[in-house]
Amino acid sequence: MSRGSSAGFDRHITIFSPEGRLYQVEYAFKAINQGGLTSVAVRGKDCAVIVTQKKVPDKLLDSSTVTHLFKITESIGCVMTGMTADSRSQVQRARYEAANWKYKYGYEIPVDMLCKRIADISQVYTQNAEMRPLGCCMILIGIDEEQGPQVYKCDPAGYYCGFKATAAGVKQTESTSFLEKKVKKKFDWTFEQTVETAITCLSTVLSIDFKPSEIEVGVVTVENPKFRILTEAEIDAHLVALAERD
């Protein structure tokens, strides 16, 4: 057996390969791309926005029941990229952790603490042989009472961080470089600019002109810190504004 091959080292989640890699955890990152979707999150001056594709895999499905945006608390929302069942399980756990925090401490959990908690749980999944990492990536948005708008992302390895803008899924690399260029030029976007930057990023990297039914947009703003999902009419207004500008 050559030392470079992954033979034997990807059987167990808890064994390092001779190169110091955990193959099962790396495979979990590949699983995020299985759904074929890309999600983008952008933080503005007084808002945070998440945008993801909405693909209905089957003609007979009721499209109103297909979603990748979830409300965790009144004021924290998330977009899940990756395997749908794993995503729902992680969202359920996040809701439990948020409710638990509220019960224990008497106030809503901040976005960064929720992300840290989910990352801690994911990290344990990379240590124990009887568990497997979840094949999904969670991007959280919310308004922090002290810090203002927040975007946090947590991955199957248990790594988490706050972002000005970030992406996950199939076109993550392309989206990230697009967002880096945008953020370098300007960063204190208004609400409209933030939503439109996120939508432009997604449509540019996928080379698609979206119809309102093909994307989902979730927002939180300082004026209205409750997480809400935009209606198709609202998304259409943003798409029209973008088209007129082009």
From Swiss-Prot:
Q: Cross-referenced Pfam families, in alphabetical order?
A: Proteasome, Proteasome_A_N
**SMART domains the record matches:** Proteasome_A_N
* Modification type Phosphotyrosine: residues: 159
Q: What induces it?
A: Up-regulated in liver tumor tissues (at protein level).
Q: Matching CDD domains, A to Z?
A: proteasome_alpha_type_6 (cd03754)
InterPro entries assigned to the protein according to its UniProt record, in alphabetical order: Ntn_hydrolases_N, Proteasome_alpha, Proteasome_alpha-type, Proteasome_asu_N, Proteasome_sua/b, Proteasome_subunit_alpha6
Write down the SUPFAM superfamilies for this protein, in alphabetical order. Answer: N-terminal nucleophile aminohydrolases (Ntn hydrolases)
Regarding tissue, the record states:
Detected in liver (at protein level).
Key words of the record: Acetylation, Cytoplasm, Glycoprotein, Nucleus, Phosphoprotein, Proteasome
| Subcellular location, record wording | Cytoplasm; Nucleus
Modified residues annotated as Phosphoserine in this record? 17, 63-64
Residues that carry a glycan: 5
What molecular functions are annotated in GO for this chain? Answer: NF-kappaB binding; RNA binding
Biological process terms from the Gene Ontology for this record are:
positive regulation of canonical NF-kappaB signal transduction; proteolysis involved in protein catabolic process; skeletal muscle tissue development; ubiquitin-dependent protein catabolic process
GO CC field: cilium; cytoplasm; cytosol; mitochondrion; myofibril; nuclear matrix; nucleoplasm; P-body
Per the record, residues carrying N6-acetyllysine are 102, 104
* Family of this protein: Belongs to the peptidase T1A family.
Self-association state and partner proteins as the record states: The 26S proteasome consists of a 20S proteasome core and two 19S regulatory subunits. The 20S proteasome core is a barrel-shaped complex made of 28 subunits that are arranged in four stacked rings. The two outer rings are each formed by seven alpha subunits, and the two inner rings are formed by seven beta subunits. The proteolytic activity is exerted by three beta-subunits PSMB5, PSMB6 and PSMB7. Interacts with ALKBH4.
- Protein purpose: Component of the 20S core proteasome complex involved in the proteolytic degradation of most intracellular proteins. This complex plays numerous essential roles within the cell by associating with different regulatory particles. Associated with two 19S regulatory particles, forms the 26S proteasome and thus participates in the ATP-dependent degradation of ubiquitinated proteins.
Know the name of this protein? Proteasome subunit alpha type-6
- Organism name: Mus musculus (Mouse)
